[in-house]
A protein has these predicted regions:
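Conserved MFS/SLC helix-loop-helix module at the cytosolic interface between two early adjacent transmembrane helices
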Residues: 55-91
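Conserved small/polar residues in nucleotide/adenosyl-binding loops
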Residues: 178-180
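Cytoplasmic helix-loop-helix junction between adjacent transmembrane helices
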Residues: 101-136
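Paired small-residue
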Residues: 83, 94-102
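Helix-loop-helix hairpin linking two adjacent transmembrane segments in secondary transporters
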Residues: 133-176
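Helix-breaking motifs and short loop linkers at transmembrane-helix boundaries and internal kinks
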Residues: 36, 68, 89-94, 123
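Residue-level signature of mid-helix packing/kink "hotspots" within the transmembrane helices
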Residues: 21, 50-58, 142-143
């Protein structure tokens, strides 16, 4: 198996831990940054990506029967990255909430493909091993990205959203999957 394919699949596994992560270290600051916001608005920032991820995981699974998996993956990655950009540019609470919904959509398209690509490219014991590595990468990313977003939140509340640019790496690697 070419290393570029492994790196591509592993990079997608890393993304499973990221949705909603950047908001966590700044939740306590949101009522100060946006004093007109309700507690419900602030809670939506952390819960909306997960709420929308669920139906889009189901939709993505169904779409893989009719649409090229790599195209679907790249669409999800683009939505994910655009979410990061829009978060960085947001100046109003309603914008952050709308972007949270967009992030959930992008994430939902990607999540089933991380394990789906393992099923597609690996068999037997090697497939089982890749599932284990995928899980480990997801958890390592969760810990690392949590530390990074916490550090960045101390500098500026917009900076934790930089983690939503990580899918650019996965997008570049996904280009190698097109020809296989």
């Amino acid at each position: 198996m070419p290393l570029v394919i492994l790196l591509g699949i592993w990079s997608i596994s890393a993304l499973n831990a990221i949705p909603g992560l950047a908001v966590s270290p700044i939740l306590g600051q949101m009522s100060t940054i946006f004093p007109q916001s309700s507690e419900f608005d602030i809670q939506l920032l952390s819960s909306l990506p997960s709420l929308l991820t669920i139906p889009f995981i189901l939709l993505s699974g169904k779409l893989t029967e009719h649409i090229n998996n790599i195209f679907l993956l790249q669409t999800g990655l683009i939505i994910f990255v655009l979410s990061g950009l829009f978060y960085m540019l947001s100046t109003e609470m309603w914008q952050l909430i709308a972007v949270s919904a967009l992030l959930g959509i992008g994430s939902g398209l990607i999540v089933p493909l991380s394990t789906g690509l393992i099923s597609r490219y690996f068999t037997g014991r090697y497939r089982t091993r890749q599932y284990g590595l995928s899980s480990a990468i997801t958890n390592i990313t969760l810990v690392s990205a949590t530390m990074l977003t916490g550090y960045l939140a101390d500098i500026d509340w917009h900076l934790p959203f930089i983690v939503y640019f990580f899918p650019i790496v996965s997008f570049v690697f996904s280009l190698s999957l097109i020809h296989i």
